[in-house]
Amino acid sequence: MPKNSSTTVSSAVEAHAGGLASGPGGARSGERDRIVVQGAREHNLKDVDVSFPRDAMVVFTGLSGSGKSSLAFDTIFAEGQRRYVESLSSYARMFLGRVDKPDVDFIEGLSPAVSIDQKSTNRNPRSTVGTITEIYDYMRLLWARVGVPHCPQCGEPVSRQTPQQIVDQLEELPERTRFQVLAPVVRGRKGEFVDLFRDLSTQGFAVVDGETVQLSDPPVLKKQVKHTIAVVVDRLAMKEGIRQRLTDSVETALKLADGLVVAEFVDVEPVAEKGKKNTAEFGGRDAEGNPRYRSFSEKLSCPNGHEQTVDEIEPRSFSFNNPFGACPECTGIGSRLQVDPDLVVANDELSLREGAVVPWSLGKSTSDYWLRVLGGLGKEMGFSLDTPWKDLTEAERDAVLHGKDFKVEVTFRNRFGRERRYTTGFEGVIPYVMRKHGETESDGARERYESFMREIPCPACHGARLNPTVLNVLVGGLSIADATRLPMREAMEFFSGLRLTDRERQIADQVLKEILARLAFLLDVGLEYLNLERPAGTLSGGEAQRIRLATQIGSGLVGVLYVLDEPSIGLHQRDNRRLIETLLRLRDLGNTLIVVEHDEDTIAEADWIVDIGPRAGEYGGEVVHSGSLADLKANTRSVTGDYLSGRRSIAVPERRRVPEKGRVLTVRGAQENNLKDVSVQVPLGVLTAVTGVSGSGKSTLINEILYKVLANRLNGAKLVPGRHRSVEGLEHLDKVVHVDQSPIGRTPRSNPATYTGVFDAIRKLFAETPEAKVRGYQQGRFSFNIKGGRCEACAGDGTLKIEMNFLPDVYVPCEVCHGARYNRETLEVTYKGKNIAEVLDMPIEEAADFFSAYTRISRYLDTLVDVGLGYVRLGQPATTLSGGEAQRVKLAAELQKRSNGRTIYVLDEPTTGLHFDDIRKLLHVLQSLVDKGNTVLTIEHNLDVIKSADHVIDLGPEGGSGGGTIVATGTPEEVARAAESHTGRFLAELLA
């Protein structure tokens, strides 16, 4: 997989920077219209020489693990990036990521390079589809310039207030009300404001960040801190006869503060919110709810006199990353963590003494303390600590969860056996968890407390992220939050159909053009079902990649080398055509595209095809074909050519399994996201494919509803399923297994051997060798995670990090163990001539042959080979595995577990990253699971898998609001006859 996880732009010079070796005799090809690679040896590449045309769409294909990504990303793109970085100053390089020099003799014809891979854009909860495409930035500008503010209280459009109207409102204050007339010249801006203080030096007093100061002796402000400065224009007490003075003061303040004036009621003492100090705006109320400040605007205010004044609308007002626009409750996140009682009390059969309250049962000292406190509460309320939680009264359970406002008497014996008593308040377990979560500085403790919480929409903004004032600024009748919730196609219709006045049209014309152009690109890559408020962290790898692709098209760059990693992942066949047209448009602008791809349609449209093989891993790394599609089909050495020409194929099953009558799962009334009260039956004991165009509701139905219900009921999980009425038929199942594409580990110490458990058996075998027995070595000696057998110089990592100050950190092999991870004594123990480090470095297929005599080991390894991972090294770090590889490692691990035929396996696009031949192997594994009586339920777009299924559930007919219904169910042949099914149309062609 590519090393660079984000869209990276790098310039690469035509000449060979860094003194790369030339070809034989120093000759150069001199071909300006081609990219030439000579002597590529990265990873499993075997001294590869290849050339292909520029300004063309070039597809790199081949079996999974054959070396496609090693050539495309780790060699060609990496060299382009390295040349660009080396052209920068050492100071600039300090801020860039580490760039490895690929193992290649030379590359010629490189252009500035852009890598667009499948890694998610980022996990920042503040990033959305709108922000990463920059559409939201243009929307903020549009709403700020032509939006019509409305009063949050009455909904009326706000209007401007005259000085006379402001004075009239102030005169309604009670007699003898003392207040100051302030001119807010600075509101929540960073700076020292030295010049401003100099200009105001004769104005008397000012309120600076809540403190009254003399302007003749102003404070020194911190430049990087936001400040609020208001000139004190007048101090008044409301009484008869001050109208003229009040009018003069208001007019003076309005002039000083550009149309703003604030009345500060000096007798109101605001109640400070714990831990917060807000100096960015005028706020605060006393215990009775009376405001300390009241703002007035000469520009915008409510016609009905509601005291909440709308400030001047600016683009920053619509940013949920800015305190002026963000919802004050959730600070712009749109959600908040809340303790869930169901997670706090995991088992209501237990009593308090038995640990029903999980947060108070973590460790003996914690448990003993809270049992004493709960004992005091029990005495006060009359319940026993031995009563099961479910048998406590509602009031008693509520007291334990939420606390009581009275004191409880706690009795305990000290270490001398003497009885002691004291009284204490009882805050309850939910306030306790919330308090500890807010106070802790430990990441581990924070994660522990968050395990008792669920994320819920913010109750103040209902997930809109913005404050009420901003949410009442409307364009075309919609707030900016409402507009971000529209699916892309509806958003396109909304913005293109906006009715604006001539003046508004003149202001908004250019902004609307930018918004519509970006929306059009997103539609072109098949993302019409997404909306702009969708968090970036929830996007699949394919969706994130296509968003970046759309952004690049919008940039209009020419002469660029784009390197893409399977852009068709997650796309239905219907949407694939539009994606290919988008790629061709990018090429026609004058760019070169290298597309790592298995999709047959994309390969067919390529200008040039490079097939890497002939097999995977150690048996690949060669260029099997470089040229046209016709020549590839004729190449009998190419496995890809065999499938494209029809010499090999994945056959339609001779017979399909017939579901046993009555043995079904039934989901009723599914209504989450775009599902429209869907009810569907999932037959058990068969292979079922869930299909439909992107955004039709497949993942919502299976992952968000069905799987979570099954996990809760069968596995004892505490997940929150999507909205539905019921799920029936669970009595037919004992276990659910969810095999997704999340990593098998987040450190290099995790690998296929450790995840599947085969490493335990291998270590045990090494411990049983004669040499190990003589030395007294136990199984733990062969672990690189604990002291004893590992190399202590690198703590079992095999590498050492060298800090280079202004240069990136360099990772070098450990000088003691030379990357083997183990010490010399451990490596002296061998089995069949191989030590433990050499075994971990074997491809899994080779290791399976090596350990063939030991069934316990070979059974694990054969399963990994069966799922198409024979090329992966046994000890390959988890961080280097792709999502598809990680998913297949998990599948192999599950295949090792004994099954009674009552297990349902839920998979989400298991064919991701797989070649035709690998899909054939995967299907064999899935069919073998079903042959044992289990159920396999897979979300899938791949037609070879769909045609091999026993049962198909097709959702649609479209994505987003146009989907969410069941279009067809039945065998692939029955779905192929469904007129409304897009999947059926493609199946019909395949089954004909």
From Swiss-Prot:
Does the keyword field hold Metal-binding?
A: yes
Could you state a single Gene Ontology molecular function term?
A: ATP hydrolysis activity
Record's subcellular location: Cytoplasm
Its transmembrane ranges are: none
Q: Which GO terms describe its cellular component?
A: cytoplasm; excinuclease repair complex
Which first-to-last residue range defines the signal peptide? none
Quote the subunit structure annotation. Answer: Forms a heterotetramer with UvrB during the search for lesions.
Family label: Belongs to the ABC transporter superfamily. UvrA family.
Q: Which PANTHER family match?
A: UVRABC SYSTEM PROTEIN A
**Name used for this protein in its record:** UvrABC system protein A
Q: Which organism is it from?
A: Micrococcus luteus (Micrococcus lysodeikticus)
Annotated gene: uvrA
